[in-house]
């Protein structure tokens, strides 16, 4: 998070978060009031009616049952967002909601923004491009929290991006070794490795819905840079830092997890056909690939 008094925490005791947001409100200044003062990951669980806890033995191979219906249904996520929005309304604290995965949460955020509350929110590539009904049993590479939900929820997330309710898309890149992903969905490490393919996965989904490359760049670069105060980058504009990728948006490729740069060849997009072949990458104006001859400046911008 940006150093302008940003905090991050899971949803827990409401009194604790009231104290946190009060603290953040006190530290706002004219310089940083448009940036994040509080950041919250949204997560609540449903207790098992029999013993007050969700048992690990309850359908440990089915992602839909174990992570969606049994422990983290969309209603719980939306309830968590409602609690945060109420605190924002009471304190005026600039707040960012992480990892939105459900349409119910989008509805809450849409209303909050309509009321002028200082709240922003993001979702992730896996919530936009994968759905729980097409995930094989015990495929632990898809395990994450909040969980990957169904197509109805996915459509609602895209609608939230299109109308500006959701401000951006972030990778939430969380790689893991084969040992960490071993076992069942109940025991395996939760996290999706998406850094190298996340942008292309979102681009593919956007193009299928009639959205553009410019939309994806706005969600995954421009808006995110502004959100955390990286004012010197994030857009293609004179005087900004030249962090650029040269991409062929209509050229397609098949994801091969073993060919990715990650140390661990585990990827939820393995085998998917995606749009967007990257041909060159520049970091601060320099070609990121070693041994590539640099060009000369011909015309001053």
PLM regions: where:
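Ser/Thr-centric signal marking residues that sit
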Residues: 123, 171, 221, 279-281
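His/Asp/Glu-enriched, well-ordered alpha-helical/loop segment
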Residues: 64-83, 87-94, 141, 160-169, ...
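Short, strongly patterned local motifs
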Residues: 1-24, 28-31, 36-54
């Amino acid at each position: 998070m940006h150093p302008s008094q940003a905090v991050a925490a899971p949803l827990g005791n409401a009194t604790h978060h009231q104290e946190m947001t009060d603290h953040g409100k006190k530290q706002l200044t004219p310089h940083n009031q448009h940036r994040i003062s509080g950041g919250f990951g949204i997560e609540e669980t449903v207790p098992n009616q029999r013993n007050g806890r969700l048992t690990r033995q309850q359908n440990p191979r089915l992602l839909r049952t174990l992570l969606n219906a049994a422990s983290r249904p969309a209603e719980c996520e939306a309830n968590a967002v409602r609690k945060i929005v109420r605190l924002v309304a009471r304190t005026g604290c600039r707040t960012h909601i992480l990892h939105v995965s459900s349409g119910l949460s989008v509805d809450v955020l849409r209303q909050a923004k309509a009321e002028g509350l200082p709240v922003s929110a993001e979702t992730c590539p896996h919530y936009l491009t994968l759905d729980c009904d097409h995930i094989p049993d015990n495929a632990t590479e898809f395990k994450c929290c909040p969980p990957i939900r169904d197509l109805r929820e996915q459509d609602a997330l895209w609608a939230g991006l299109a109308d500006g309710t959701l401000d951006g898309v972030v990778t939430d890149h969380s790689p893991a070794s084969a040992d960490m992903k071993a076992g069942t969905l109940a025991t395996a490490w939760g996290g999706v490795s998406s850094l190298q393919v996340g942008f292309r996965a979102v681009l593919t989904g956007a193009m299928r819905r009639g959205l553009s490359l410019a939309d994806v760049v706005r969600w995954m670069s421009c808006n995110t840079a502004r959100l955390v105060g990286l004012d010197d980058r994030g857009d293609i504009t004179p005087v900004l830092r030249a962090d650029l990728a040269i991409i062929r948006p209509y050229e397609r490729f098949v994801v091969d997890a073993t060919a990715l740069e990650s140390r661990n060849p585990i990827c939820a997009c393995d085998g998917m056909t995606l749009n967007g072949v990257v041909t060159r990458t520049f970091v601060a104006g320099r070609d990121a690939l070693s041994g590539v001859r640099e060009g000369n400046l011909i015309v001053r911008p």
